[in-house]
Amino acid sequence: MAGSFAELAGRFGFRTDQGRIDAKTWREGTIFLGVPLAVLTLIWFFLAPFAQHDLAKTPFLAWGTVATFVYLLFYAFAILLIAICHYNLSAKRWRDRGWPFPGALAGLLPLTALVSGAAHWLQPREAEIISYWYVAGIDAALVAIIAWNVVEVGCFGARKP
C-alpha cells in the first residue's frame, strides 16, 4: 500500500489496478482526477454551441468549429484516460475493502458515467426514439453508484481477511 497520495501520484499510481490503498488516498485520488474533469467539462459547455455547424449559414471550414472539434477530440481522450485512472484507483480500494470481484465493482462507476454522458449526447438528437426518462433513469443510477462508492470505499476502513 502506498504511504501517501503524493507517493502514489508521484510514481503514477493510477497505471495499474494491482495493490491496495486506504480511504484517504482514494478520496485524494478521486479529487485529483475530478478537478481536471470538471475544468475540461466546463470548457466544453462553453464551446459546445460552436459545434453546431450549418453549411447554409457558415463556410465549410469555419475555424471556430474546427477548433471546437479539435478540443472535443482532446476532451474525449482525457475523459477516457480519467475513467481508466479512476478504475485503477478504485480497484485498489475495492480490493482493500475485501469485496469479491474488485475489478467489476471498480468499473461500475466509470461505465455508468460514460453511458450517462452518451445518453445526454444522444437524447437530443434522437428525441423521438429515446425519451428523456431513460436519461433521467441512467442519471439516477449514476447518482446512486456515486453515493455507494463514496460511502463504501471513501469512508470505511479495510476489512480483515
Walk through the language-model features, giving the residues of each.
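Membrane-helix interface segments in multi-pass membrane proteins
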Residues: 39-80, 111-145
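Membrane-interface extramembranous regions at the lipid-water interface
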Residues: 1-38, 86-101, 145-161
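Alpha-helical transmembrane segments of integral membrane proteins
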Residues: 24, 28, 32, 67-74, ...
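Mid-length scaffold segments of soluble, non-membrane domains
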Residues: 79, 83-87
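Central hydrophobic cores of alpha-helical transmembrane segments
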Residues: 103-112
